[in-house]
Amino acid sequence: MKLFRYYFILSMCLTVVQLSAQKMKDASVDASKPTNLYTQINSAFEYQSLKNGTHLFGTRINIQYAFNPDNLLLVEVPLLYNDNSKSFGISDTRVRYFHVVKRNITSRFIAIAPFADVTIPSGSFTKGLGSDVWSITAGLVAGYLISPKISMFPGIGYVHVTDPNKYAGSSQNGLNIQTNMSVSFSKRAFLFINPIVTFLSKTIWTGELNFNYMITPNKLKINFGYFPNFTNDISTFRIGTTLFL
């Protein structure tokens, strides 16, 4: 019954987003720059391989609604199966708000945008589907053009992680730094390269390598991504599609 409820709520959200975004359907889409904000629905198949031999796989639904060109709300819901616990269900969900406060500061300094990012422990920790902690990040991203085909979007954020309930541990505060580079091969193909380091009680090194290709300009995109957690020896792979509304 819980799973049905999640699917129902997700379906309602998809319907609302699609109806409210009709006025933006003819907008030109340049998704190679993360500070360009568009209403979109992302759906991906995900596979995770953990150090202890556990494997998780399923789907990750990501809905982004652009209230206007400078404000965007993201909601992400993963539905995963853990082969070790033989459990399927919702994993930790994510909510993110992004606001571009300034664009085109100079010919190369193209944007500055604060953000708030919250990971909600909606997944079951005992079933291996969730982290059992809230993670809250507030920070800033800047956009900088290196060349017509290469741009960088470095970001820095303050991170707070709450006390866990189901295992020994304490709350943590730290810093997250990323250096997201976008490389455009053509008007349709581009690659994100994003090394990330998070300083908490221990330093966590992660990364993103995500190739994107626009099948239908302004409407449909596919992507292939590798998201390693080097510190905890976790490898995540995703194959997905994006529908711009």
Residue map of PLM features:
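Cleavable N-terminal export/targeting peptides
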Residues: 1-34
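Transmembrane beta-barrel domains of Gram-negative outer membranes and organellar outer membranes
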Residues: 22-162, 167, 173-245
